């Protein structure tokens, strides 16, 4: 996938006529492109991540498709449905102001179901400090923590050295990013997730106008925001993210519990897309 997020070597493409970059695909294949020229009077920026103590790759399951994160899971039952359908990540809202918020004890039960099914449990945090997030992650047996809001994002540089992190970027309706990743630590994040300005609302943004920023993470990037079974194929085809995140798009009529038929339809639509 030709995006600005890679896992090994990153070059600001404006400085080159062509570039050399190594990119791990979802099928565990490595694609390389060779540099053929350098544009004069432009700066070249290159950074290579330290290969020591690298967190495990989330694409090692070798599936030739985008990875799937099902978020806003509120019960072990819904987690089991999601895992059985093929979800790679099970997301839980650890934020009291969300209608899909759950307690740490329920989160621990969900984490157990996720891990037993081969999925990774993710805790979603909004405006919490690093100590609060670390305590909750330990208590709930989370694999990754997802950082929303300026408060939680401010703790990124401290958290990323202790926990696997999904760093959230928000885009407005026109597809313009409203925040950025700290450049000095962005390569330490496991994933970059691009969401709408109001995550979990079911509202998306203009995919056609969105431009992926030149940032990198260990695994790549996830797309969220207004995704559902009827539009996920279009979203994947336009932006070709490494993974897709769905929450309200697979909910039942109460907007909280997950709907089995919607989960099935969503997975079927995702599996119909191959990059």
UniProtKB/Swiss-Prot annotation:
KW Isomerase (keyword) present: yes
Tissue expr: Expressed in roots and shoots.
Transit peptide location: 1-32
Keyword Cell cycle applies: no
Record field: catalytic activity: N-(5-phospho-beta-D-ribosyl)anthranilate = 1-(2-carboxyphenylamino)-1-deoxy-D-ribulose 5-phosphate
Induction: By silver nitrate and UV irradiation.
Pathway in which the depicted protein is active: Amino-acid biosynthesis; L-tryptophan biosynthesis; L-tryptophan from chorismate: step 3/5
Subcellular location: Plastid, Chloroplast
Disulfide cross-links: none
PANTHER family per record: N-(5'-PHOSPHORIBOSYL)ANTHRANILATE ISOMERASE
UniProt entry keywords in alphabetical sequence: Amino-acid biosynthesis, Aromatic amino acid biosynthesis, Chloroplast, Isomerase, Plastid, Transit peptide, Tryptophan biosynthesis
Principal subcellular localisation of the protein: plastid
Family per similarity comment: Belongs to the TrpF family.
Enzyme Commission no: 5.3.1.24
GO cellular component terms, A-Z: chloroplast
InterPro entries named among the record's database cross-references: Aldolase_TIM, PRAI_dom, RibuloseP-bd_barrel, TrpF_fam
Biological process terms in GO annotation: L-tryptophan biosynthetic process
A GO molecular-function annotation: phosphoribosylanthranilate isomerase activity
Full protein name: N-(5'-phosphoribosyl)anthranilate isomerase 2, chloroplastic
């Amino acid at each position: 996938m030709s995006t600005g997020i890679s896992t090994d070597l990153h070059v600001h493409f404006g400085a080159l006529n062509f570039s050399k970059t190594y990119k791990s695909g979802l099928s565990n294949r490595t694609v390389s492109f060779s540099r053929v020229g350098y544009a004069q009077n432009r700066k070249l920026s290159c950074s290579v991540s330290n290969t020591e103590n690298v967190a495990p790759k989330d694409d090692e399951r070798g599936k030739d498709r985008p990875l799937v994160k099902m978020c806003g899971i509120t019960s072990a039952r819904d987690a089991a449905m999601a895992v059985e359908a093929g979800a790679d990540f099970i997301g839980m809202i650890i934020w009291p102001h969300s209608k899909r918020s759950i307690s740490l004890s329920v989160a621990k039960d969900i984490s157990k179901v996720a891990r037993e099914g081969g999925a990774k449990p993710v805790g979603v945090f909004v405006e919490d400090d690093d100590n609060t997030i670390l305590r909750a992650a330990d208590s709930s047996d989370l694999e990754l923590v997802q950082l929303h809001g300026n408060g939680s994002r401010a703790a990124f540089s401290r958290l990323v050295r202790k926990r696997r992190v999904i760093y959230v970027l928000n885009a407005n309706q026109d597809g313009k990013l409203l925040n950025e990743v700290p450049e000095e630590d962005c390569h330490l994040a496991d994933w970059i997730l691009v969401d709408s300005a109001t995550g979990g609302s079911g509202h998306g943004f203009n995919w056609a106008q969105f431009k992926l920023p030149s940032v990198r993470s260990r695994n790549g990037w996830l797309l969220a925001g207004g995704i559902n079974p009827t539009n996920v194929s279009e979203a994947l085809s336009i932006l070709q993210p490494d993974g897709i995140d769905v929450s309200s798009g697979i909910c039942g009529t109460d907007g909280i519990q997950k709907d089995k038929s919607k989960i099935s339809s969503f997975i079927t639509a995702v599996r119909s897309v191959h990059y």
